[in-house]
């Protein structure tokens, strides 16, 4: 199963989701509708393995690759590719949050990722 995780900046939620899904053995990509220049420092502090990742612009190639597209706050900017399953997760943006809030967001993402098929 190929899963694409999308948020606005690809600097927090979608990066965490990709890492957690890959940690379960799944195939994942992540992207953003308006990518940041780097992963949010708050996220990198909690998940140091993400510190060197570079946020990526969402394109239709990624959406076409995916069997499931999980969106997190990108609204109408996310492309819709016929035949793909779309799931929207209403999650807070970790940008600017303290480490405890980022941990809560990460834990919620981890819980939801565990429910996705591999």
Name these PLM-found stretches.
Residues 1-118:
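Short polar/charged helix/loop
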């Amino acid at each position: 199963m190929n899963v694409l995780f999308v948020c606005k900046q690809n600097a927090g939620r979608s990066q965490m989701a990709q890492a957690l899904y890959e940690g379960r053995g799944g195939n994942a990509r992540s992207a953003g509708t308006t990518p940041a220049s780097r992963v949010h420092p708050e996220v990198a502090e909690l998940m140091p393995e993400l510190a060197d990742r570079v946020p990526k612009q969402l394109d239709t190639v990624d959406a076409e690759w995916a069997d499931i597209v999980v969106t997190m706050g990108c609204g109408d900017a996310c492309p819709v590719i016929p035949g793909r399953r779309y799931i929207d997760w209403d999650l807070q943006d970790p940008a600017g949050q303290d480490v405890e809030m980022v941990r809560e967001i990460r834990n919620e993402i981890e819980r939801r990722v565990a429910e996705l098929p591999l």
